[in-house]
Amino acid sequence: MSLMAHVRRKLCRGHLLRCTLPLTLLLFLTVGLKHLAIDCNLAHNNDIPMGSCMASYYTALNLSAPGEKNCHRIIQGDTEEARRALLDNLMVKKRRLVATDGDYINATSDCKFFRERRKYITFSLSQVEQDFPIAYSMVIHDNIEMFERLLRAVYTPHNIYCVHVDKKSPESFQQAARAITSCFDNVFVASKLESVVYASWRRVQADLNCMEDLLQSNVQWRYLINTCGTDFPIKTNAEMVKALKSLNGHNSMESEIPPNYKKRRWEYHFELKEDSNKIVQTNTRKKPSPLPVPVFSGNAYIVVTRNFVNSLFVNPTAKKFIMWAKDTYSPDEYMWATLHRFAEMPGHMPAHQKYDTSDINAIARLVKWQSLEGDMNKGAPYIPCTGTHRRQVCVYGTGDLNWMVQQHHFFANKFDPKVDDNAIQCLEEYLRYKTFHPTENVA
């Protein structure tokens, strides 16, 4: 026996606590640190993380934008930094390669690697979010990279996502979309697909197909949000849950008295010309709507309760109205808005004009219409678009971000990586940071 062992044994004789307490403490620290390491290890944790793990999780899952741009300064409104990013975008987009359908088909051959490489958040971040699942109806037809980035931005394991893929889309796009969805238990392609035509009934039917599938899922979601492939969130999932709870069971969408020029869209019978994929007005006037309220104007994007969605399929009057709308022009721009004012629909708002809601006041979608852009000091609702315009709608640029993140909407439309990918990259970085640092004021 060594001299030190002999001395230690002699000191411990008759002093059991003196010797066992340090050993017990050492054992406790060893086991405790081991479990702490496991709790903060993404490979071992599918549970809600402890607050002490959030920093290490963010380090592993951050989506810092590539290049030299400073997204934090851009989001905070640094006009010089935004200008540099816009100039950088002009140079980068000439040589940037957008991910193809084939790239995603290959990348998803190993789903675990795909989820890790693309930094999906595969665990719930709070009990509040876990107890308030959201359903998504995602209608897409092209640009697989934009769809996948949108999915990653809104993905949580407790939500449920239905993806409607246009039947007219190239086979490679459809395969890529199915490949991506196959990597998640709570993401699926709609059971019935439509050949969507702009301004036709089929655009509404695409959402209805997803709604029906979502009602049949095992997830007891509370609200439904519908999106398209050019949307991107400007709120985290936690922020959306907080806002949805504050609705107190009401829906949120644009719903206003329509301008006169829009009324012909539902006053006349329209036909879809299959050879040209265009909607054509006939001389046949339609019978009045079966609803006991006037027709209201809105848009395709809505935030509605589960009970509202269920009533679309079971309320007799709502079903008659849906049938009545099938031969009209762009029914998505008035059907939801009108049903929202029907007293038998859950979460409705009264039909009186005092309850009219503009797209600015609704939370569903932030859109900049070219005709309304201008100097806000002179009464314009928003500043000019810094990207470009498509169908009179702003395709956002980096310079729009500071204004955008100060709005209350859940999503903004439109985005396109071919127009300004820096805008999307900075939003990705901003949202991921806020997700793991919810109490910080980043903007």
Curated annotation (Swiss-Prot):
Covalent S-S links between cysteines: 71-228, 162-385, 183-210, 394-426
Keywords per UniProt: Disulfide bond, Glycoprotein, Glycosyltransferase, Golgi apparatus, Membrane, Signal-anchor, Transferase, Transmembrane, Transmembrane helix
Alphabetical list of Pfam families matching this protein: Branch
Pathway: Protein modification; protein glycosylation
Membrane topology: Single-pass type II membrane protein
Protein name per Swiss-Prot or TrEMBL: Beta-1,3-galactosyl-O-glycosyl-glycoprotein beta-1,6-N-acetylglucosaminyltransferase 3
Lumenal side: 34-443
Organism lineage string: Eukaryota, Metazoa, Chordata, Craniata, Vertebrata
Enzyme Commission (EC) number: 2.4.1.102, 2.4.1.148, 2.4.1.150
Primary enzyme class: transferase
Carbohydrate-modified residues: 62, 106
GO MF assignments: acetylgalactosaminyl-O-glycosyl-glycoprotein beta-1,6-N-acetylglucosaminyltransferase activity; acetylglucosaminyltransferase activity; beta-1,3-galactosyl-O-glycosyl-glycoprotein beta-1,6-N-acetylglucosaminyltransferase activity; N-acetyllactosaminide beta-1,6-N-acetylglucosaminyltransferase activity
GO BP annotations, alphabetical order: protein glycosylation
